């Protein structure tokens, strides 16, 4: 499973493929959906990307990819369920390996970041599993917003995976550091490389030099691109269901991102996975949630925030409500739109 632009033929294939996945009676598909916690009718692109895909990929990351072929070609429901459960176990194992490497990589990144002075991050460790370094690189970019290379070494031989940010062409960056690499490939935002341990420091210095020459100060802060500014009175089931027509969302067809300025925080609750709010604007009050946030996230009761969000329908106890999934927020200023 991989990520591709969801435009043109790709989007058509995915729309039809999601229908096939939802209706398929193939034992392997049924079993994979079962262990992934997907039940009921429709299958979404998000469920493919975050539930089915990781279990398919986990086989090749920690075991052998042929298991996926066996799963999808068997006519036996019993065999399919056994293999699907194995893939689910591999995915849990992959997540454990990812957590271990991510913890070490975050420590290195925090030490190297130097208060934002670095324009790039090259992180490495002995024994870091090659099956998870790409995921770890993505997590580091999410946290620090720098072109990031994560390398796992085994007896002096390193395999690296990299992720980039807007304005820095990764493979072009590698090309300018090619004297330190055994081989490399990829595209603008993702790539891979092979490197010897003795070349690690020279490569990191050269890569940082290229990043400094390429990226200005404004490039080092993530840009939130808003599709439309809305008042809460414009937000409801009608809009949410019109957006359904635009699905499936993904690369090349991103889910619309909205912004409401100066929303008043009525309630706020921090919970293990993030922060929940009740926000009020234009005479309407809506629920909102941001995942992965903590006590320091903007917006205390009584304050006003500018909030960027996507829409979702939240079903609970048999009732539905439109909820805001917060992407970014900042304290509202007098100059807010």
Protein language model regions, located:
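Hydrophobic helix-and-loop "lid/oligomerization" segment in the mid-to-C-terminal part
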Residues: 1-199, 229, 269-271
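Mid-to-C-terminal polyanion-binding domains and interfaces
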Residues: 79-85, 89-123, 168, 175-337
């Amino acid at each position: 499973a991989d990520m591709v632009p969801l435009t043109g033929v790709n989007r058509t294939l995915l729309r039809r493929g999601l229908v096939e996945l939802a209706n398929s009676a193939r034992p392997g598909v049924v079993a994979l959906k079962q262990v992934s916690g997907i039940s009921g009718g429709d299958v979404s692109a998000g469920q493919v990307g975050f539930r089915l895909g990781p279990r398919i990929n986990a086989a090749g990351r920690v075991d052998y990819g042929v298991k996926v072929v066996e799963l999808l070609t068997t006519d036996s429901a019993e065999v399919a369920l056994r293999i699907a459960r194995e893939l689910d176990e591999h995915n849990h194992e992959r997540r454990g390996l990812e957590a271990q490497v991510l913890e070490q990589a975050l420590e290195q990144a925090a030490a190297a970041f130097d208060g934002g002075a670095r324009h790039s991050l090259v992180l490495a460790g002995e024994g870091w599993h090659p099956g998870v370094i790409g995921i770890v690189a993505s997590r580091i970019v999410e946290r620090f917003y720098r072109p990031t290379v994560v390398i796992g070494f085994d007896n002096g031989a390193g395999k690296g995976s990299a992720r980039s940010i807007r304005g820095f062409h990764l493979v072009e960056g590698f090309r300018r550091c090619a004297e330190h690499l055994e081989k490399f490939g990829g595209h603008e935002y993702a790539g891979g490389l092979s490197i010897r341990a003795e070349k690690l420091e020279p490569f990191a210095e050269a890569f940082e030099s290229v990043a400094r020459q390429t990226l200005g100060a404004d490039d080092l802060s993530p840009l939130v691109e808003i599709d439309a500014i809305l008042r809460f009175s414009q937000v409801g089931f009608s809009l949410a269901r019109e957006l359904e027509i635009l699905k499936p969302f993904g690369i090349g067809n991103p889910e619309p991102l909205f912004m409401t300025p100066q929303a008043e925080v009525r309630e706020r609750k921090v919970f293990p996975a993030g922060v929940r709010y009740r926000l009020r604007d234009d005479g309407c009050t809506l629920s909102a949630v941001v995942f992965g946030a903590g006590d320091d996230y903007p917006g205390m009761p009584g304050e006003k925030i500018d909030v960027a969000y996507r829409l979702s329908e939240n079903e609970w106890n048999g009732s539905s409500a439109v909820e805001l999934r917060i992407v970014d927020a900042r304290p509202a200023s007098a100059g807010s739109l």
